Amino acid sequence: MTDTDRIQINEARIRAEFDELARIDSESFGEREMADRLKEKLAELGIQAKEDDTAEKIGGNAGNLFGTLKVGLSGTPILLSGHMDTVAPGIGKKPVFHEDGTITSDGTTVLGADDLTGVIAILE
């Protein structure tokens, strides 16, 4: 079995994850709820997240999250990176899932997918 054979992407789980996280208000400098939820999700995966003091330095309410997963393999470590914030208008986001597989906002806010999709890929 190859590594590719072991990869199992669960589309329903990804869509549900996107729906949940996209609905969290996380405009720049106001990512506290998103940071707390991501810490919970990382903990569910056995990853302890640490938060730095960036919030204090920039006038925000959440710092950067760092999680380390030790897998016991030799080789070069890799870094996965994403951001938690969205641009305005991003309060009260409502993702709309279309039959063709696309996801859009309801038109009253941004969708906030620019890096939420990256965050979800990291969680997956």
Which functions belong to the PLM regions below?
Residues 2-32:
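N-terminal capping segment at the start of a domain
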Residues 4, 8-10, 68-70, 103:
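Hydrophobic alpha-helical segments, principally membrane-spanning helices and signal/leader peptides
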Residues 15, 19, 36-39, 119-123:
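Predominant activation on well-ordered alpha-helical scaffold segments within soluble catalytic domains
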Residues 16, 41, 90-94:
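Extended interaction regions within the primary functional domain
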Residues 27-74:
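A non-catalytic alpha/beta surface segment that caps or lines the substrate-entry region
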Residues 61, 68, 74-124:
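Active-site metal-coordination/substrate-binding segment of hydrolases
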